[in-house]
Amino acid sequence: MDFEAVIGLEVHAELSTNTKIYCGCTTEFGGQPNTHVCPICLGLPGSLPQLNKRVVEYGIKAGLALNCSINKVCRMDRKNYFYPDCPKNYQITQDEVPICRDGYIEIELENGEKKRIGIERIHMEEDAGKLLHTNAGTLVDYNRAGVPLIEIVSRPDIRTPEEATKYLEKLKSILSSIEVSDCKMEQGSLRCDGNISVMPKGSEKFGVRSEIKNMNSFKALEKALSYEYDRHVEAVTKGETLEQETRRWDEANSVTVLMRSKEKANDYRYFPEGDLVTLNISDEWIEEVRKTIPELPHEKAERFVNEFGIPKYDAMVLTLTMDMAKFFEETAVKSEDAKAASNWLMGDISRLMNEKTIEVKNLKFNPEQLAQLIKLINAGTISNNIGKKVLDDMFKSGKNPKDIVEEKGLVQNNDEGAILEVVKKIIENNPQSIEDFKNGKKRALGFLVGLVMKETKGKANPQIVNKVVSEEANKM
């Protein structure tokens, strides 16, 4: 029997506000433990929350960008539970009437088809504190308590771990492009829980669901869902009974680990938050927020394909972050060579950034300098290989490529006569290569070209070298 997965994702995104959702404490990441706190976010008696207007605006903005309907009347609710990271013993969130509902994201599958993943709801809530487990005991840091979140709950429309990854990547790119969240998974500002079950292909009845936590990267998400899918299929095939569980992804051992069995009934005893009034959102407010939404990543990617003529794949990669998209567009315009701009950014520049673990915004050179490098190569002033060496220098120093070329004497040798002299010398010293060429071994020419480039320290024009070597070899 063939099975398929039924997957839904719950994504928590910390909002990029300066202050917390119900008080004036800073949302800055880090800091000494329990220094970004006040009576409100600590839940001390007599303290009263006040809803941050910017949080509501960001909730509306996210909803519009994700094709949601905005609930014009919504409210905050108390979610009651006891845990050390929750100082009030309840979380102020939204239950029955969230700020947004019925949205969707479109992802592109491997075969080029588009698939729509439904979004059931988006609701606003406060984050909890953080627990630090030590040998001596467990410590609690409440700096994060009260930091504003939106939780984006997908419908169970996802059928493979790969689709789940594409959904999360698309969601991340949209949220960061509209600047409601920095979406830094390594800092916990974008967190994802997954719900997965399996069912026979063609069936409409979902199986028993597992919730998976601690998936803090795209790779972890895909691996955890794949593992859990295999575990469910194996259990069902053997006739074993699965229980509804919450499990944790163990990255070190590449397995999911049981955290707790889950009660089927909702035991959080939600009820309306009496200290906050019902929220009324006018059409005028929604339209004001709509005007602040920039060109979204998929719209930008489509424009890049049409305007710059780059491949669709390149456009999708370049628009994963707005910083990269902006850097590409400025370079493409200034260099008048969009394909070269795309190749440099997706190739050598991305490699260097990955090696040093830095982002585009932290590069020491700007789009104008990269455009200058591309123009130097296109004009024949330097070769592509020399261009890579110049880029390495730009990456370290931030110097202009022209200055680097002049300082290091890297100008390309386009003098065919001078190159001919080097070629003759190389051929004279390598008679066996000429013999191999005559015997039909075309690669012998490549060997000779390599020797010429080495002799000229990479400064000879490769096109001229190839031409002269071929001409001289054919004379022999």
UniProtKB/Swiss-Prot annotation:
- Transmembrane stretches in the record are none
Cited Pfam families:
GatB_N (PF02934), GatB_Yqey (PF02637)
Q: Which SUPFAM superfamilies match?
A: GatB/YqeY motif, Glutamine synthetase/guanido kinase
Known catalytic reactions? L-glutamyl-tRNA(Gln) + L-glutamine + ATP + H2O = L-glutaminyl-tRNA(Gln) + L-glutamate + ADP + phosphate + H(+); L-aspartyl-tRNA(Asn) + L-glutamine + ATP + H2O = L-asparaginyl-tRNA(Asn) + L-glutamate + ADP + phosphate + 2 H(+)
Molecular-function annotations in GO: asparaginyl-tRNA synthase (glutamine-hydrolyzing) activity; ATP binding; glutaminyl-tRNA synthase (glutamine-hydrolyzing) activity
Q: Which InterPro entries match?
A: Asn/Gln-tRNA_amidoTrfase_suB/E, Asn/Gln-tRNA_Trfase_suB/E_cat, Asn/Gln_amidotransferase, Asn/Gln_tRNA_amidoTrase-B-like, GatB, GatB_C_1, GatB_Yqey_C_2, Gln-tRNA_amidoTrfase_suB_CS
GO BP terms: glutaminyl-tRNAGln biosynthesis via transamidation; translation
Keywords (alphabetical) are: ATP-binding, Ligase, Nucleotide-binding, Protein biosynthesis
EC number(s) reported in the record: 6.3.5.-
Function, as annotated: Allows the formation of correctly charged Asn-tRNA(Asn) or Gln-tRNA(Gln) through the transamidation of misacylated Asp-tRNA(Asn) or Glu-tRNA(Gln) in organisms which lack either or both of asparaginyl-tRNA or glutaminyl-tRNA synthetases. The reaction takes place in the presence of glutamine and ATP through an activated phospho-Asp-tRNA(Asn) or phospho-Glu-tRNA(Gln).
Subunit structure, per the record? Heterotrimer of A, B and C subunits.
Q: What family name appears in the similarity comment?
A: Belongs to the GatB/GatE family. GatB subfamily.
What is the protein name for this chain? Answer: Aspartyl/glutamyl-tRNA(Asn/Gln) amidotransferase subunit B
